[in-house]
Amino acid sequence: MPKLVIVESPTKARTIRNYLPKDYRVEASMGHVRDLPQSASDIPTELKGEKWSNLGVDVENNFAPLYIVPKDKKKIVKTLKDALKDADELILATDEDREGESISWHLLQLLQPRVPTKRMVFHEITQEAIQAALKNCRDVDQRLVHAQETRRILDRLVGYTLSPLLWKKIAWGLSAGRVQSVAVRLLVQRERARRAFRQGSYWDLKAQLTVEAGQFEAKLWTLAGQRLATGNDFDESTGQIIAGRQVCLLDQQEAEALRDRLQTQPWQVKSLEEKPTTRKPAPPFTTSTLQQESNRKLRLSARETMRVAQSLYERGFITYMRTDSVHLSQQAIEAARSCVEQMYGKNYLSPQPRQFTTKSKNAQEAHEAIRPAGNTFRLPQETGLSGAEFALYDLIWKRTIASQMAEARQTMLSVLLEVDNAEFRASGKRIDFPGFFRAYVEGSDDPDAALEDREILLPALKVGDRPTCQELAAIGHETQPPARYTEASLVKMLENEGIGRPSTYASIIGTIVDRGYAQLVSNTLTPTFTAFAVTALLEQHFPDLVDTSFSARMEQSLDDISNGEVDWLPYLSQFYRGDRGLEEQVKLRESEIDPAAARTVALEGLPAKVRIGRFGAYLEAEADGEPIKANLPKELTPADLDVQRVETLLRQKTEGPDQLGTHPETDEPIYLLTGAYGPYVQLGAATEEKPKPKRASLPKGMSLETISLEQAVGLLSLPRTLGEHPETGRRIQAGLGRFGPYVVCDLGGGEKDYRSLKADDDVLTIDLDRALELLAQPKKSRGRGKEPIREVGLHPDDQAPIQIFEGPYGLYLKHGKVNASLPEDEKPETISLETAVAALAAKAGQAKAKGGRRSTGTPKSGETKARTTKTTKKTTTRRTTSR
């Protein structure tokens, strides 16, 4: 009889099958086979009347979780049970972390095997690793199971207790989460700091100097013995120099006068300093640092990074990608050092094998950092990988190799020059030995730090040299507000604060964006007005749940539970049902929370209130005793909402939109408006005969304040015909779409060939020759390209394909015109047709319930003001069921 091996995914099954004897049968569980109920329909009929049933956790009975087998997993469970009937041994080979241990435990509970059962663990899928794992099987680790279950229960209690409160008090569909809400608050706090920021300005001088050996640059350092002010000397809340700072602050007039005075004065080298330094390579990747570097260097989201890493792991290219450890095994160190010696030579090897120590208290040193799999590392170009998979493997390979390379040696150079009563400083850097720089330089959110492998050479100088000043310029500077978080910097902050676990960061950030708490704009996470409202409510009424210190202590308690140092049941009881437990706090606070106040976003200094409505944020003010409401554009951020913007939106609402001018051909007025999706121009007013007048969005770089009448007429004429294709005779046009300006060639039969315009192209002036040049270039995918990641199957209703695509916010399912985010617990390689159909049906139902929404400010004939239509180790018995 065969031995049955169960893993999570078909990809992992295919890979591991290659390394097992022929009498082993490998099946995939497709992830979790049991979970807490996701909706009321999942709850067994006999339990629907229980007070706790909606939680899916029996808080009256030692927090016993109610586990159900989802509908889309019942067929899988049956397949596994049938396979087990023909097996003489069961081997559970799910991932080695808490989640994997939990899947194995649930499989045991469901399958109830009557044959010997083993737990097989490995951190890479290679022949050597699989053979070693087979010889060293163990039992399911109940501590890991309990740890995962406690986290799951705690997350459910927080989410399912607080979210309904948010629905009642702010808006339906909002959610709160143990880690999610803390992460959102971090974004909101940074945005508040940006609103409170006051800009300061300062001036300095920059000199271009020459000596016989060459040219160099120097900047003003001191004046009359006092250090010149820089941006770091300003108070962000006042825009003034921080009290007590003894610095020299120059304005434009003073800087220019100083420039004129110093230009004719002699310059002399006062001192030289050379300081040798060394730089050590960064440790190999953990889950967190991989997400950070991938975001900085590859512009991959945390979610996409983990998806690609999962694929690389399951196909045997890298070790397990969910780890807090920076430890490398002896075989990995030897493999890395062998690569270094072969590619760069012995002198680029570190003198001794370098081993890193994991700082995380709960990281397991038996686990390894993320590295290329195997006893020898495949070169990136020899893997056959492409796209994001190649880029991520290349990143992991380089980081691992660099960890065993010699330190980089460099010399920091500093030259002080004096001219009259001023001192200038020239700085340089000489790389004496590049060491690990040859392979890898760690990324940084600081652009200056990101250039640390670049030399800045100075000509040969000595004290007393008299350089000639070729040019002296006065340069103005303005201080900048605190930078918004990128995915990389948010992940780093969460890890530094001890909030959540790195393995969950990708899904947390994805959820924040999916739920509308943040927008991803130019790789930065910008919180929405809804995020402000929810954070304010939680800060006022449930401050512990969004406090970083409290969250870190909670995370530590959960780790202590997993280590057997803390009992899980008293902890849960105290958290949820204690005197100041969550259950009691929600009961007490619910009546105190005024919905009108909760829906109001507190932004100081504005002549209107910002409120959260059914369809998003809007302004509310009064004029002549009458209330005025105006929708806020979706791309408008809380930090950028100022008095001028508020007044413009309200004025458009009361007086109608501004009129730019009259169309030279139709004599119709051209209006300037702002809608939910940004600024646009409109030709004429809306009438019964013409309810939808011609509109055109403003392209990037154009604003309502600067657009000319000629430009507006041009935009309203789009798409414009440029001519015919010389080979096919088909029409070529230029236009403006959701992805920006483009040219398009009609191919006939409803098919069209599009190309985006380049930065230097203008949609209003591009000609046929340039359009043909663009159309001749290879077509690029925008992420929502024509090539799906996977086709799940045919929809049972219309036999149309259901496909998985990659979008700006992660992976999504597509069926016809309906798109739905890939469910959090599902993987693109393993999601079943039934689950995909259910997710699409739920999304279609939401869209139908919500209806549509039109933009603001459309003038109607005969009206003086615009109108807006808003359509816009546990001893308890777990409850289980397979219904």
Swiss-Prot record:
Domain Toprim: 2-126
Alphabetically ordered keywords of this record: DNA-binding, Isomerase, Magnesium, Metal-binding, Topoisomerase
Domain Topo IA-type catalytic per the UniProt entry, residue ranges: 141-583
InterPro entries: Topo_IA (IPR000380), Topo_IA_2 (IPR003601), Topo_IA_AS (IPR023406), Topo_IA_cen (IPR013497), Topo_IA_cen_sub1 (IPR013824), Topo_IA_cen_sub2 (IPR013825), Topo_IA_cen_sub3 (IPR013826), Topo_IA_core_domain (IPR023405)
Source organism, top-level taxon: Bacteria
UniProt-listed Enzyme Commission number(s): 5.6.2.1
Pfam families, sorted: Topoisom_bac (PF01131), Toprim (PF01751), Toprim_C_rpt (PF13368)
Region (Disordered): 271-294, 842-883
Gene Ontology BP, a term: DNA topological change
Record flagged with keyword Oxidoreductase: no
Annotated site residues (Interaction with DNA) in this chain: 32, 151-152, 155, 160, 167, 322, 515
Keyword Magnesium annotated: yes
Matching SMART domains: TOP1Ac (SM00437), TOP1Bc (SM00436), TOPRIM (SM00493)
Location of the region described as Interaction with DNA in the Swiss-Prot/TrEMBL record: 175-180
Cofactor(s) the protein needs: Mg(2+)
Binding-site list for Mg(2+): 8, 95
One GO molecular-function entry: metal ion binding
Entry function: Releases the supercoiling and torsional tension of DNA, which is introduced during the DNA replication and transcription, by transiently cleaving and rejoining one strand of the DNA duplex. Introduces a single-strand break via transesterification at a target site in duplex DNA. The scissile phosphodiester is attacked by the catalytic tyrosine of the enzyme, resulting in the formation of a DNA-(5'-phosphotyrosyl)-enzyme intermediate and the expulsion of a 3'-OH DNA strand. The free DNA strand then undergoes passage around the unbroken strand, thus removing DNA supercoils.
Subunit structure: Monomer.
Name recorded for this polypeptide: DNA topoisomerase 1
Organism name: Synechococcus elongatus (strain ATCC 33912 / PCC 7942 / FACHB-805) (Anacystis nidulans R2)
